[in-house]
């Protein structure tokens, strides 16, 4: 596609979610890449200016670099569709489903995709029954947050209440999830094609917000070092997990590989990070796709699915 055919592009960044800081980093990295490629691209932060200004300012399409609520949950996608403005990533329904880990897990279970067992929690939950079912340790997290915000690993039953309260500060839907010990992996999908798997090794604790975006000790291996047969099997399952939610364009599917070689899928991200610590650019690089090329490919897909 000719660069001129992309028209005037708004890079949506920042936003109102708890992931605003990361979205600003992703958005500015995307903006710089587009401008290096001679795309007429401009930053647009929905905080402080209404989305309808996109039409008033003559934008032709949007690159969504928003993360979390109001940007990755179908809200912005719906507004852009009402304005008939093409955008990157998945549509309204797939975005909303992927943002909701509870409904994602229900769909994956119905489709035969392995995901850790779970229990939905509320203020009246019997935590003893939860630990009897899921065992310890377990994970407690908000159903509709990203970047592991509000997530805690619970090693002892007496810590269940405080972990629940932390998660409930971020969302009315809270999940207690079976903890799977194993290798943390992520599978990036670009234009319905799985990219090389990324293996994540955290030296201490969980792969949480700090480890994802700020730690210099988190180790990433791409390609993952797994056998070709196992890699292909995981990539195929990740692509199926992406498709069954209705995702289009690009996404990132996170999983744990247990000691028996069984992948357990955790979540799908329809607007993955694009910072210097981010995993999709890392996977693309291993596939021979530079960051600038990746950004252009994602943007071009907004034309295909428009």
Curated annotation (Swiss-Prot):
One example of a Gene Ontology biological process annotation: regulation of cell shape
Lineage per the UniProt record: Bacteria, Pseudomonadati, Pseudomonadota, Betaproteobacteria, Nitrosomonadales
The EC number(s) this enzyme carries: 6.3.2.4
A molecular-function term among this protein's GO annotations: D-alanine-D-alanine ligase activity
Annotated catalysed reactions: 2 D-alanine + ATP = D-alanyl-D-alanine + ADP + phosphate + H(+)
Protein's gene: ddl
List of residues binding ATP: 131-186
Function: Cell wall formation.
Main location: cytoplasm
Name of this protein: D-alanine--D-alanine ligase
UniProt keyword Nucleotide-binding present: yes
Cofactor: how bound: Binds 2 magnesium or manganese ions per subunit.
Pathway(s): Cell wall biogenesis; peptidoglycan biosynthesis
Domain of life: Bacteria
Subcellular location: Cytoplasm
Family statement: Belongs to the D-alanine--D-alanine ligase family.
Cofactor: Mg(2+); Mn(2+)
Domain (ATP-grasp): residue spans on this chain: 105-300
GO cellular component, one term: cytosol
InterPro entries: ATP-grasp, ATP_grasp_subdomain_1, D-Ala_lig_Van_CS, D_ala_D_ala, Dala_Dala_lig_C, Dala_Dala_lig_N, PreATP-grasp_dom_sf
NCBIfam families in the record: D_ala_D_alaTIGR (TIGR01205), PRK01372.1 (NF002378)
């Amino acid at each position: 596609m000719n660069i001129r055919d992309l028209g005037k592009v708004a890079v949506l960044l920042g936003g109102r979610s708890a992931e605003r800081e990361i979205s600003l980093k992703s958005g500015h990295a995307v903006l710089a890449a587009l401008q290096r490629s001679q795309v007429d691209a401009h930053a647009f932060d929905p905080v402080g200016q209404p989305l309808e200004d996109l039409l008033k300012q003559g934008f032709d399409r949007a690159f969504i670099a928003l993360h979390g609520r109001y940007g990755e949950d179908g809200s912005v996608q719906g507004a852009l569709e009402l304005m008939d403005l093409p955008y990157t990533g998945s549509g309204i329904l797939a975005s909303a489903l992927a943002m909701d880990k509870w409904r994602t897990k229900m769909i994956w279970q119905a489709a035969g995709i392995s995901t850790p067992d779970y229990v939905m929690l509320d203020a009246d939950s019997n935590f003893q029954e939860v630990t009897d079912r899921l065992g310890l340790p377990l994970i407690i997290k908000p159903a509709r947050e990203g970047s592991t915000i509000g997530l805690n690993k619970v090693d002892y039953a007496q810590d269940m209440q405080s972990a629940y309260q932390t998660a409930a500060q971020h969302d009315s839907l809270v999940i207690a999830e079976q903890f799977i010990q194993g290798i943390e992996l992520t599978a990036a999908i670009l234009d319905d094609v799985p990219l090389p798997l990324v293996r994540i090794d955290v030296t201490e604790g969980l792969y949480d917000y700090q480890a994802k975006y700020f730690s210099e000790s988190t180790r990433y291996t791409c390609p993952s070092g797994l056998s070709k047969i196992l890699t292909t099997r995981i990539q195929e399952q990740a692509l199926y997990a992406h498709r069954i939610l209705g995702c289009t364009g690009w996404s990132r599917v996170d999983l744990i590989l247990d000691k028996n070689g069984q992948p357990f899928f955790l979540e799908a991200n329809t607007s993955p990070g694009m910072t210097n610590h981010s995993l999709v650019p890392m996977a693309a690089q291993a596939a021979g796709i530079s960051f600038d090329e990746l950004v252009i490919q994602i943007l071009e897909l907004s034309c295909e699915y428009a």
